[in-house]
């Protein structure tokens, strides 16, 4: 199914299906992070090892606040400021945060932290809000291939194996940078 309806796309996620959708820079694959079967389908489609982990994408700070509480107040504020002051033309930032007991182990892979990004991309914000929480976000491509930059690219990779939320990419030219919130280390510049 190809849709432009955020409501239909959120229903696909709620039904345990995989969805391709445009993000800030490239097309992503998403699912309900708490649905292991849907998550395994993404790994199968991407031919990606589970050890690598994936990003959780949220539409609002309130969807991830519980993951910030163990951090020092100054670090919490830095992360919130980074997400809330993000400009559409700027590169997005994903933070590695301490995972709480509610984050499934398959999301983190072999890592002790969970990768989280609060997006300002309008379609992604609407999707996360319609889904009422964060979703899995990993680039829409088989491992070793270039990420999809259009609906056509995503369809060429995956055909009818999943659903598509059609819309515009954001203005960023690069995937998000990744920063470890505990150490400040930039993992992906």
From Swiss-Prot:
Keywords noted in UniProt: ATP-binding, Cytoplasm, Nucleotide-binding, Nucleotidyltransferase, Transferase, tRNA processing
Domain YrdC-like: 3-189
InterPro entries to which the protein is assigned, alphabetical: DHBP_synth_RibB-like_a/b_dom, Sua5-like_dom, TC-AMP_synthase, TC-AMP_synthase_SUA5
Record GO biological process: regulation of translational fidelity; tRNA threonylcarbamoyladenosine modification
Source organism superkingdom: Bacteria
Pfam families named among the record's database cross-references: Sua5_yciO_yrdC (PF01300)
Main location class: cytoplasm
Top EC class of this enzyme: transferase
Enzyme Commission code(s) on record: 2.7.7.87
MF GO annotations: ATP binding; double-stranded RNA binding; L-threonylcarbamoyladenylate synthase; tRNA binding
Cellular component terms per the entry's GO annotation: cytoplasm
Reaction(s) this enzyme catalyzes, per UniProt: L-threonine + hydrogencarbonate + ATP = L-threonylcarbamoyladenylate + diphosphate + H2O
Subcellular location, record wording: Cytoplasm
Membrane-crossing residue ranges in chain numbering: none
Entry function: Required for the formation of a threonylcarbamoyl group on adenosine at position 37 (t(6)A37) in tRNAs that read codons beginning with adenine. Catalyzes the conversion of L-threonine, HCO(3)(-)/CO(2) and ATP to give threonylcarbamoyl-AMP (TC-AMP) as the acyladenylate intermediate, with the release of diphosphate.
Family (UniProt): Belongs to the SUA5 family. TsaC subfamily.
Name of the featured protein: Threonylcarbamoyl-AMP synthase
Taxonomy of the source species: Bacteria, Pseudomonadati, Pseudomonadota, Gammaproteobacteria, Moraxellales
